[in-house]
């Protein structure tokens, strides 16, 4: 009662209020919404393409390029995802519903994208939501009348969200996208198996109880309860039955990637599977690496052809020879000592314990320090639960990559793209190694139905994954049994609270994907994706071409796989992204209602000027994959192998040759743009700076964008060259 009075609710109106809650506060479904904006006009798209062609002609001069570069996002969540629903509850201080229809309007008129996909978590998609989202995809794909200036292509899909408790049973997250809604699987296929409850989404059940503290928003919390109950009550499909023969309204699951690939084969649908967020240690067990998936159980080279190297959760490209734990031959872990570049969380747990040793004997303090280290190693990604009442600042910069560009939180280096390209599986003999030959992309992993948020750096709480309650009233405090004694975290997904305060310093507006496509049609974009003629950027629309110019059959673009004996020669062409004007273009203002425009775009849209940012340099990375079992990884990754200045130009052309080509080699390039302000752009964890976290909760000013200067960039897909 006192809680309600503190909110300004008097005793006299409480009975009326509760009657209202009982009669109208029951939870219900959230509809898919209605698309408001019409397709973009042919004239506006034609004008946009002319600007691209002008830059392209400058870079190619006498040589003609038959492709155009289109931009998209293949990682988008809506309110149909349980975590997305929870993060937008009133207690979080954000907006609320972000339905599937909003994604179409945002993509067209806020982000000005050419294509995107829906990727709600399969583990929380109900049968009705799956059917409704297919209808939205169909509606959103209705374009203008001219196929040459087709304005937007939308691909259906879902996210397979698997989290393990050990390196051996952790497979990670994968987006599954499809070309068409025809022949689409009848059900999304998730990873949640019987006896696991809702898995990682079990922690959201606590949020439903907040309706009693926020009676004016009672219905919204009840809607979350409805969604959780509905998902929980969907019957599991029987195992061992062909997907085509299962009932429409059961929940289908795949325990491993191999199971997922097999089920996709049963549907015979054209699909692409995209691993993502691999280095993001928010849920990933210590010691996890690409090694346990480079086999038929974890990889299908015909489907798993693209890798997301950048998202709103950070950069997953770079390998570093750092370790949060040492693995002994016995299988046990030990805590490594810190270095100048890396602070293991297990070590910092010991330092935190030392500050809680007042009144203890030296022997007892030492024992507790060692126990804190042991529990931190056992807790894996749930480090924060060893001392649940400790301030997040006490953990300092532990387990973070301190010199990576926009690093993912709790960085797992053996999950990086570079590590993946360096390893080989020799189970079939040294002359027939199995390797990853990914194309590189970037996307957002946005959870507010906002595809392509990286066009501008603004509104940190709306355009990134920053999370946290809006005031102390909503802050959930985990009580320690003894604040001065370490606790052993539970590691089953959904049983422990992740480190949501520290992670908010490692969230970004997200990346964007570019395709070299022969046109704007769905078939042409899909063909570019399948051919891996793609690249990713950290958000800005940098233009990038990377070609092998002396391949046996002529030029070979990024994503190619070539066998050749002569030294390879390459050419790189790049142009900086357009500097942005404030606000939104007239077309966006005229196409959406003021309310819709403000709700989705928050006052800013993709609105390019005529000026481009400078490309400072081109960095070439060379990786020579393992040629025998046990070959050390670090020497195989040369980052950067070459760095070539662009001499202060916004358009840059460089050529280079590898005169030391002597074994199978992988090459890709980074185009590095001039310094610009970015959300969480400065590595706040550097020892040279005052340590300060950028929190998603009220503990950092919600209007603070935590700007820091950084060099935005683009990553080409690799060119894979095998020595005969």
Language-model segments: residues:
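Sec-dependent signal peptide recognition
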Residues: 9-16
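Short, intrinsically disordered, low-complexity segments enriched in Ser/Thr and Pro
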Residues: 101, 105-108, 112, 189, ...
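Extended substrate/RNA-proximal surfaces in nucleic-acid metabolism proteins
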Residues: 134-280, 305-308, 312
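C-terminal motif of bacterial Sec signal peptides marking the signal peptidase cleavage site
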Residues: 23-25
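Active-site-adjacent structural elements in enzyme catalytic domains
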Residues: 64-71, 76-80, 86-169
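C-terminal functional module detector
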Residues: 27-91, 117-130, 134-135, 229-251, ...
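N-terminal secretory signal peptides that target proteins for export/translocation
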Residues: 1-9
């Amino acid at each position: 009662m006192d809680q309600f009075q503190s909110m300004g609710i008097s005793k006299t109106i409480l009975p009326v209020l509760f009657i209202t809650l009982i009669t109208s506060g029951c939870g219900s479904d959230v509809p898919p919404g209605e698309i408001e904006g019409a397709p973009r006009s042919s004239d506006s798209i034609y004008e946009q393409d002319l600007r691209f062609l002008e830059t392209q002609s400058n870079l190619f001069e006498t040589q003609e390029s038959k492709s155009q570069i289109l931009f998209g996002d293949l990682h988008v969540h809506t309110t149909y995802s349980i975590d997305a629903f929870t993060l937008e509850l009133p207690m979080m201080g954000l907006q609320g519903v972000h339905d599937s229809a909003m994604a179409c309007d945002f993509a067209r008129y806020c982000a000005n994208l050419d294509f995107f996909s829906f990727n709600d978590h399969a583990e929380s998609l109900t049968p009705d939501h799956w059917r409704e989202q297919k209808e939205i995809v169909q509606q959103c794909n209705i374009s203008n009348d001219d196929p040459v200036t087709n304005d937007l292509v939308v691909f259906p899909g879902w996210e397979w969200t698997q989290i393990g408790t050990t390196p051996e049973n952790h497979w990670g997250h994968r987006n599954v996208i499809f070309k068409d809604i025809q022949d689409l699987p009848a059900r999304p296929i998730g990873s949640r198996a019987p006896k696991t409850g809702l898995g990682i989404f079990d922690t959201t059940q606590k949020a439903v109880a907040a309706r009693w503290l926020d009676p004016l928003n009672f219905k919204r919390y009840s809607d979350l309860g409805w969604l959780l109950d509905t998902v929980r009550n969907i019957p599991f499909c029987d195992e061992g039955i062909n997907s085509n023969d299962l009932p429409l309204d059961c929940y289908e699951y795949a325990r491993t990637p191999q199971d997922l690939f097999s089920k996709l084969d049963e549907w015979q649908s054209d699909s692409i599977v995209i691993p993502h967020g691999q280095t993001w240690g928010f849920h990933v067990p210590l010691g996890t690496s690409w090694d346990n998936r480079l086999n038929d159980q974890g990889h299908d080279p015909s489907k798993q052809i693209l890798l997301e190297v950048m998202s709103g959760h950070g950069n997953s490209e770079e390998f570093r020879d750092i370790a949060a734990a040492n693995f002994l031959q016995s299988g046990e872990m030990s805590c490594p000592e810190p270095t100048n570049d890396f602070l293991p969380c297990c070590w910092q747990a010991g330092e935190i314990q030392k500050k809680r040793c007042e009144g203890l004997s030296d022997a007892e303090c030492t024992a507790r320090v060692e126990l804190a280290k042991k529990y931190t190693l056992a807790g894996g990604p749930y480090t924060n639960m060893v001392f649940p009442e400790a301030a997040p600042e006490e953990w300092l910069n532990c387990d973070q990559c301190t010199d990576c560009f926009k690093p993912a939180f709790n960085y797992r280096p053996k999950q990086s793209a570079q590590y993946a390209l360096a390893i080989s599986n020799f189970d079939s003999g040294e002359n027939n190694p199995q390797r990853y030959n990914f194309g590189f992309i970037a996307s957002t992993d946005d959870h507010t139905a906002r595809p392509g948020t990286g066009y501008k750096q603004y509104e940190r709480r709306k355009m990134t994954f920053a999370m946290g309650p809006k005031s102390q009233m909503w802050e959930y405090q985990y009580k320690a049994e003894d604040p001065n004694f370490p606790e052993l975290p539970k590691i089953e997904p959904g049983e422990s609270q992740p480190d949501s305060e520290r992670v908010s310093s490692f969230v970004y507006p997200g990346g964007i994907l570019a395709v070299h496509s022969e046109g704007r049609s769905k078939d042409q974009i899909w063909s570019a994706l399948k051919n891996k003629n793609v690249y990713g950027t950290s958000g800005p629309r940098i233009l990038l071409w990377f070609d092998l110019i002396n391949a046996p059959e002529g030029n070979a673009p990024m994503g190619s796989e070539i066998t050749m004996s002569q030294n390879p020669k390459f050419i790189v062409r790049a142009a900086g992204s357009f500097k942005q004007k404030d606000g939104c273009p007239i077309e966006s203002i005229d196409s959406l209602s003021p309310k819709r425009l403000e709700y989705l775009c928050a006052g800013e849209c993709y609105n390019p000027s005529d000026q481009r940012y400078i490309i400072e340099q081109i960095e070439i990375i060379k990786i020579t994959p393992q040629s025998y079992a046990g070959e050390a990884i670090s020497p195989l990754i040369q980052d950067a192998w070459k760095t070539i200045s662009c001499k202060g130009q916004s358009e840059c052309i460089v050529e280079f040759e590898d005169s030391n080509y002597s074994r199978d080699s992988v090459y890709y390039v980074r185009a590095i743009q001039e310094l610009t302000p970015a959300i969480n752009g400065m590595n706040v964890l550097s020892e040279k700076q005052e340590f300060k976290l950028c929190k998603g909760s009220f503990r950092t000013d919600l209007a603070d964008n935590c700007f820091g200067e950084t060099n935005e960039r683009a990553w080409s897909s690799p060119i894979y060259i095998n020595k005969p």
